[in-house]
């Protein structure tokens, strides 16, 4: 940018169409967060009415994780072939239909299937909305686009909690799911009133349709085997998270089977760039493993170890959720200022200073605990707002929506594993110590993976002929594309 351009406030670099595109996607992501957390809010009511066991009730939450990876792949491929806008609208309709179906569910099986649909729609919304906004904004503002967008999910969760307190006591739990009709109306408005993403339009103008991830996996020469592996992965995930398996060896074996299948899909769809894709799945996996123990078990910690009443728990959780939402926006500014990877590492390092005090302070001062959680979540959880920008930069426009959707949602299985890890460690330690130690140690793994740019580094080690030296979204160089100690002159931009 020129000096005169740099002196202009960042928001004036955006025209009305770009703001409209962002606002629409942000509202879609808010609705996504709203719909996703509804089941957690009414789980006890659903369990009581349907006469479910604790395992069956918990499986209604896990169901969304079982289907997310396939939704990210399928709807991401739709976004790569037909445009980001159509994929985003389709995703909103899908998770809204699933939410509405939960309201009409006569029993466990119907609600479980509806939750599978919600998981697919949620995954598609993540990949399509993120690529839509990022590709619609100027290159030097794309970390802000990513961070601001992801903040919508946290806001949606806060809105859901407030709506729950107003609706359920008066009209019952089903009425909460009937609100799912509203996003469908919003999606129909989106279809007519928002433009297509600029990067996608430029890439596809006057060209033949691209060969998507779905084409490669399910229409290629290995389609039969891939279909069988898809069913095998779905069945394995169901047995792991909803099948009440007691044998740890069997669960580990099924988890290994899923890992092999997902890596196989990445190798087939990414060709020579498969090392980058596999490492990105690991980055996301560990990002969920360090953050979700706190996300999932913090309410339990506050109620059991600190003996807080429900009102106090709600206040503390507000600080935590609001901190994450603010952190997404702060992460956007940091990313555009320092660069995506450097901002990520600096924010996580700062969050490490706070994680021990959060669980060491005890419950004597609620406000101090709330403030510590606010800043810890702002720095540790909120920085994940720029994760779509980080992942998307490793994929070309033709494969970005499916690549981002599949990679992120496979790694998101860490969100289902994280509470289990926290609970297992808590059998030997108190819950606060378990959460602090797990988050503290695994955050360092993410710092190393991102700070050393391991996706590019492993690509250079294993398949250097397909190495990309620059970010496909903002053209910034990848530090892992050259050996450590090499100067800036070592970066020679490769054709994407």
From Swiss-Prot:
Annotated compartments: Cell inner membrane
Keyword Membrane appears in the UniProt entry: yes
GO cellular component: a single term: plasma membrane
Catalytic reactions on record: N-acetylneuraminate(in) + H(+)(in) = N-acetylneuraminate(out) + H(+)(out)
Highest taxon, organism lineage: Bacteria
Record's bilayer topology term: Multi-pass membrane protein
Transmembrane segments: 22-42, 58-78, 86-106, 116-136, 148-168, 170-190, 224-244, 247-267, 278-298, 313-333, 353-373, 374-394, 406-426, 431-451
Main location: membrane
Keywords: Cell inner membrane, Cell membrane, Membrane, Sugar transport, Transmembrane, Transmembrane helix, Transport
GO molecular function: carboxylic acid transmembrane transporter activity; sialic acid:proton symporter activity
Record-linked SUPFAM superfamilies: MFS general substrate transporter
Role played: Catalyzes the proton-dependent transport of sialic acid.
Family as reported in the entry's similarity comment: Belongs to the major facilitator superfamily. Sialate:H(+) symporter (SHS) (TC 2.A.1.12) family.
Name of the protein this chain belongs to: Sialic acid transporter NanT
Source organism of this protein record: Salmonella paratyphi A (strain AKU_12601)
């Amino acid at each position: 940018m020129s000096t005169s351009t740099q002196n202009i406030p960042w928001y004036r670099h955006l025209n009305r169409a770009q703001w409209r595109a962002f606002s629409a996607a942000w509202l879609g992501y808010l609705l996504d967060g709203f719909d996703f957390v509804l089941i957690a809010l009414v789980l006890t009511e659903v369990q009581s009415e349907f006469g479910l066991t604790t395992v069956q009730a918990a499986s209604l939450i896990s169901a969304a994780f079982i289907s997310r990876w396939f939704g990210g792949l399928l709807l991401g491929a739709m976004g790569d072939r037909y445009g980001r806008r159509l994929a985003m609208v389709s995703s909103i309709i899908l998770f809204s239909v699933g939410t509405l179906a939960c309201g009409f569910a006569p029993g466990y099986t119907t609600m479980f299937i509806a939750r599978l649909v919600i998981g697919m729609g949620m995954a598609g919304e993540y990949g399509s909305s993120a690529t839509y906004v990022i590709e619609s904004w100027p290159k030097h503002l794309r970390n802000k686009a990513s961070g601001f967008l992801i903040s919508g999910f946290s806001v949606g969760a806060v809105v859901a909690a407030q709506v729950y307190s107003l609706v359920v006591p008066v009209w019952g739990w089903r009425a909460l799911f009937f609100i799912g009709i509203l996003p469908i109306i919003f999606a129909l408005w989106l279809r007519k009133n928002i433009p297509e993403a600029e990067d996608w339009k430029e890439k596809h103008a006057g060209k033949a349709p691209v060969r998507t991830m779905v084409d490669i996996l399910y229409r290629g020469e290995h389609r039969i085997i891939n279909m069988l592996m898809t069913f095998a992965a779905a069945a394995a995930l169901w047995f792991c998270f909803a099948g009440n398996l007691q044998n740890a060896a069997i669960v580990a074996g099924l988890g290994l089977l899923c890992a092999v299948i997902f890596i196989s899909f990445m190798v087939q769809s990414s060709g020579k760039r498969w090392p980058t894709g596999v490492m990105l799945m690991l980055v996301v996996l560990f990002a969920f493993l360090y953050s979700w123990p706190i996300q999932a078990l913090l309410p339990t910690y506050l109620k059991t170890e600190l003996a807080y009443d429900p009102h106090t728990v709600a206040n503390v959780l507000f600080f935590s959720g609001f901190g994450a939402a603010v952190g997404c926006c702060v992460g956007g500014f940091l990313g555009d200022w320092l660069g995506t990877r450097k901002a990520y590492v600096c924010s996580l390092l700062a969050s490490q200073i706070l994680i021990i005090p959060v669980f060491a302070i005890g419950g004597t001062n609620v406000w101090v605990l709330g403030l510590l959680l606010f800043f810890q979540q702002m720095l540790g959880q909120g920085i994940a707002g720029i994760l779509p920008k980080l992942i998307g930069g490793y994929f070309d426009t033709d494969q970005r929506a499916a690549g981002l959707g599949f990679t992120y949602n496979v790694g998101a299985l860490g969100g289902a594993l994280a509470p289990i890890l926290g609970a297992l460690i808590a059998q030997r330690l108190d819950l606060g110590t378990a959460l602090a130690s797990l988050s503290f140690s695994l955050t360092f793994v993410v710092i190393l993976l991102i700070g050393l740019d391991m996706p590019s580094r492993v690509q250079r080690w294993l398949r250097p002929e397909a190495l990309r030296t620059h970010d496909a979204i903002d053209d910034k160089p990848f530090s892992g594309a050259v050996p450590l100690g090499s100067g800036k002159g070592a970066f020679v931009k490769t054709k994407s």
